[in-house]
Amino acid sequence: VQLFTHIYQLKLIPPTGKSCIFACELPLKEIEVMKAYFIAILTLFTCIATVVRAQQMSELKNRIDSLLNGKKATVGIAVWTDKGDMLRYNDHVHFPLLSVFKFHVALAVLDKMDKQSISLDSIVSIKASQMLPNTYSPLRKKFPDQDFTITLRELMQYSISQSDNNACDILIEYAGGIKHINDYIHRLSIDSFNLSETEDGMHSSFEAVYRNWSTPSAMARLLRTADEKELFSNKELKDFLWQTMIDTETGANKLKGMLPAKTVVGHKTGSSDRNADGMKTADNDAGLVILPDGRKYYIAAFVMDSYETDEDNANIIARISRMVYDAMR
C-alpha cells in the first residue's frame, strides 16, 4: 500500500519573469527525489539569471566607459537593489557629497524626533543671526533680517526639497552637531564616508568641501537602509522623509532628466562652485527610483573635479541614470 501526500506544488519563476506551477500527487518515498529535482531546476534558473545580470552590468560599465571617454571629470556610480549591489564604478574614490549630506542630516534629526516623540509640527524659533548671508537660502529670502518661527516639517522641507543651506545648519545643531550625525550614520552599519563640516564650514575654504565625502556604494546603501529598514517607530517620519525627497525641486536635469515623465524618483542633489581654474568640485545626485512594476533601486551618481560645463555634468548623470533604468527593466 502506498501512502500519498497532498497535491505537491512548486512554482517556478524563470528569468523571463513568467511563472509556471507544477502539481502532482506522489508517494512519500518519491518526494525527496522530486525535491532534489526541483531544487536543481531552481538552482539552474538562479545561475542563468545571475549570469545574465552579470553580462548586463558588464555591458553597462562598457557603455559608461564610452560615455566618459574624453571627459575631464571623475565619475562614480553605485546601484543597489533589495538583493544587494548591482553596479560599482570608481567606488574606491572619496567623492565630496556637497548637499547630498542633507539626507544624512535628515535621518539624524528624525531619529531624535522619534526617540523623543517630537512632532513634525513642533515649532522652532529662529534668530535672524542664524540666517547667514552669501549662501543659498530661500528661507532667508522669505524671512529677511528678522526672527521667526517655523515647524520642523517646514524646516526639513527647506533643507531637502529646496536644499537650503541655513535650514540645514539649524537642523545639524538641532540633531546634536555634525559629529553626532556622523556617528549615527556609522551606527547604521554604513562605512566609507565621513561628515565633519556644516554648510557654513564647507563655505570656509575650497578644500573644506572635500571633508564631507562618501563612496558611491556607501551612499546607495544608506538610501536602501533608510527605505527598507524601519529606523523609526513612528511610520509618519519615514513617509515624510521619502515624500520630501520625491518633492525635491533641485536637479530635475540629473537623475530624473532622461527618465520617463511619470517615473517616481526620491532624490537629493549636490552642487559646488568652481575654483579660479574653472574646476567644479562636484555635481551629484542620489536617490531611489521606482520602476513601473513596483521594484526599486537605489542609485548614487557623483561627478568630481569637473572641467565640463554644468549642463554636461548634469547630462552625464542623466544619461547614466537612463542606462541603469533600462538595464534594470
What are these regions (language model features)?
Residues 1-8, 12-57:
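Bacterial Sec-dependent N-terminal signal peptides
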Residues 55-96, 273:
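Beta-lactamase-like hydrolase cores
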Residues 89-91, 151-155, 162-168, 199-207, ...:
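Flexible glycine/proline-enriched surface loops and loop-helix/loop-strand junctions
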Residues 111-131, 178, 182, 234-238:
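Short, well-structured active-site flanking segments
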